[in-house]
Amino acid sequence: LSGAVVMKKFGLTPKGKAFSGITVEDDKPVQLTRQILKSLKWIGPAECEFLKDEKGHYFLMEINSRFPSWLYLAAAAGQNLPLLTVQLACDMPVRPLTSYTAGKLFVRTVADALLDARQIMELTASGEVRL
């Protein structure tokens, strides 16, 4: 495991997806992820999602074979995971990322785009829109 950031969700959509979260200091999910990915002989980005119960027990909920959707939070916390992945893929020497800043927060937002119907037709016909 060359890099890992633990994020706690605290804003969820009705489908359980995080729209806000915070980096936390908790080595247990990192240890569990390391064990799981080693057992799978996994190479490449991955996200292991755990549920922690009130007794402090962790339950694996899912494994995603990609970077997490909150990847920018990892970078804000001090780990550039895509760069690390490229360096590993290119057989470049890397120093495992073993620390990050706890207390970094992300909030996902949505922005509306207003277009004229002609612009939609232009996009459909040409693949681009001139604004």
Go through the PLM ranges and name each one.
Residues 46-47, 96:
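A short linear hydrophobic-aromatic micro-motif
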Residues 56-58:
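Conserved protein kinase catalytic/activation segment
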Residues 60-62:
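Pre-DFG segment of protein kinase catalytic domains
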Residues 83-131:
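Peripheral (often C-terminal) accessory segments that flank ATP-dependent C-N-forming ligase machineries
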Residues 1-41, 45, 52, 64-89:
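ATP-dependent carboxylate/phosphate-activation module, predominantly the ATP-grasp catalytic core
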